[in-house]
Amino acid sequence: MLAVPLAVHVVVIDNSQPGLNLSFIQDERVTVVPTGANLGYGRGHNIALAASSRRCRYNLVLNTDLQMGPEVLPGLVEFMDAHPSAGMTMPKVLYPDGSLQRLCRLLPVPVDLIGRRFFARTRWAKARNRQYEFHDWNYDTVAEFPFLSGCFMLIRRSVLDTTGYFDERYFLYAEDLDLSRRINAVSRTLYVPSQCVVHEYRSQTRPSLRRLRYAAVSLTRYFSKWGWVHDPARYQANRKTLDQFDR
């Protein structure tokens, strides 16, 4: 991150117990914030966002298992500078073997996420997921989506000041969905495939009961907040997204 040809401020959240010895980091561009515990994905990133320099025009939220070349961040910053309506961008994301991660999505209805989590191998769940993740699209052109993955979110600071940070009621899962739709409501959330990163994500064929519990709690909170059935903003955002491909 420090090798990119930009002025950057890196905030590292150390949630280990006891804290790691990071005294070897002497670069003034790096701030280490020890929390002493895992506070959750959203809350941890909120601490980093609050600690970031107020002079930053953009904030980057990314997973620790993500790799990118030094050209990616400058390329996306250049794109957002040229497109002031863009509040957030995400690059093309690949698995380590070079295959595509389909991370451009619609705002889900409950059946979408229930199907993905518990009935993924059924025909109806596969059909819904095909539209939800745009399997019939080539992922090679700039397009707008209301839900972009939290593994890499480059966010315009002025937009983030308007929407607020992550909702800390989600410990794990759905925090990126919630923030992405709030940003999409006030600006454009764009997929920019001219830049590419590698995400070493590995899905669990049999997720632990603990993770299933986190998912159930977070999704219950999400749909209770935005609406289980009646969610006009969801319908409008999804219709706008699908209309891009009907022209």
Q: For the regions a protein language model found, what residue spans apply to each?
A:
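Acidic donor-binding segment of Leloir-type glycosyltransferases
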Residues: M1-A37, I47, A51-R54
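Active-site acidic Asp-centered loop
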Residues: N15, T35, V61-T64, D167
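Acidic metal-phosphate-binding loop of nucleotide-sugar-dependent transferases
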Residues: L39, D65-M68, Y170
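Short beta-strand-to-loop acidic/aromatic patch adjacent to the donor-nucleotide binding site
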Residues: R55-Q67
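Conserved donor NDP-sugar-binding/catalytic core segment of glycosyltransferases
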Residues: Q67-L103
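A short, conserved alpha-helix in the catalytic core of glycosyltransferases
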Residues: W137-D140, E144-C196
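Active-site-adjacent helix/loop segment of glycosyltransferases
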Residues: L177-R181, A185-R247
